[in-house]
């Protein structure tokens, strides 16, 4: 798959950063020494962490060279490392492992989440936010378009790139035996978007990537045209002309045992 596009991702940075801010607001630890930002992207979440904990040894982790370059330019005094989160092991126990909108792209959560929790220092915190929108019209439309077109064979596995987020009960059972406390909540954000095209542009940077990457440029344009037609009907204009994009997200904050 082609590398991520930081410029496209940042088109809706305020909307993408709001859940990161909400997640950070639920972290109550003070003066952490070691922090890792897993899936740091272009550094918007890392910047929040740096402002909150300016004295911490903060490292941003991502597998995208383009995103890391953008993050380093944004925060030249912070450390960024290219790594696969599945293979990531810090050199010392972490006081805070923060993952905003990244772990939904990884598989094997029953192994991954306890593994991350085990890499915390005593009283450390694992803080996670994941989009939980695969059943939303925006993502159902992706699968519908993929199954109906000349790209059907090419895109057979596109939907498997991202697994469905597990239930809150499942994550609680994975973490609670190894944690002092586990807080889980779900929030649905309603983003007023100026047009159906704006919704498509938002998703081109993230959810649509596995569907567009295998296609030729001509097929990408045709796919997006078909997708836009469905989105236009799925998100009708409100009284002010805007389209309301519902975006549910799952939050998890697990506190390590003392």
Curated annotation (Swiss-Prot):
InterPro entries: Methyltransf_25 (IPR041698), SAM-dependent_MTases_sf (IPR029063), Trans-aconitate_MeTrfase (IPR023506), Trans_acon_MeTrfase_C (IPR023149). Its EC number is 2.1.1.144. GO terms for biological process: methylation. It is found in: Cytoplasm. One of its GO terms (cellular component) is cytoplasm. Pfam families: Methyltransf_25. One of its GO terms (molecular function) is trans-aconitate 2-methyltransferase activity. Gene3D superfamilies: S-adenosyl-L-methionine-dependent methyltransferases, Vaccinia Virus protein VP39. It catalyses: trans-aconitate + S-adenosyl-L-methionine = (E)-3-(methoxycarbonyl)pent-2-enedioate + S-adenosyl-L-homocysteine. Keywords: Cytoplasm, Methyltransferase, S-adenosyl-L-methionine, Transferase. Belongs to the methyltransferase superfamily. Tam family. HAMAP family: Tran_acon_Me_trans. Catalyzes the S-adenosylmethionine monomethyl esterification of trans-aconitate. This is Trans-aconitate 2-methyltransferase. The gene is tam.
């Amino acid at each position: 798959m082609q590398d991520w596009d930081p410029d496209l991702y940042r088109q809706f940075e305020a909307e993408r950063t709001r859940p990161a801010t909400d997640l950070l607001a639920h972290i109550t630890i003070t003066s952490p020494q070691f922090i890792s930002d897993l899936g740091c992207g272009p550094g918007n979440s890392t910047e929040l962490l740096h402002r909150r904990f300016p004295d911490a040894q903060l490292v941003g982790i991502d597998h995208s060279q383009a995103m890391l370059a953008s993050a380093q330019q944004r925060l030249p005094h912070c450390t960024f490392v290219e790594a696969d989160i599945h293979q990531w092991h810090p050199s010392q126990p972490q006081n805070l492992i923060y993952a905003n909108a990244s772990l939904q792209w990884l598989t094997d959560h029953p192994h991954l989440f306890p593994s991350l929790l085990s890499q915390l220092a005593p009283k450390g915190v694992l803080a996670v936010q994941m989009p939980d929108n695969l059943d939303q019209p925006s993502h159902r439309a992706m699968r519908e378009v993929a199954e109906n077109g000349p790209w059907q064979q090419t895109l057979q596995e596109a939907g498997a790139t991202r697994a469905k987020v597990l239930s809150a009960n499942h994550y609680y059972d994975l973490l609670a035996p190894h944690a002092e406390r586990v807080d889980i909540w779900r929030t649905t954000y309603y983003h007023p978007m100026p047009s159906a095209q704006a919704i498509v542009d938002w998703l081109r940077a993230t959810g649509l990537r596995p569907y567009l990457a295998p296609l030729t440029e001509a097929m990408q344009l045709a796919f997006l045209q078909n997708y836009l037609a469905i989105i236009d009907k799925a998100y009708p204009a409100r009284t002010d002309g805007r389209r309301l994009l519902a975006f549910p997200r799952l939050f998890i904050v697990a506190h390590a045992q003392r």
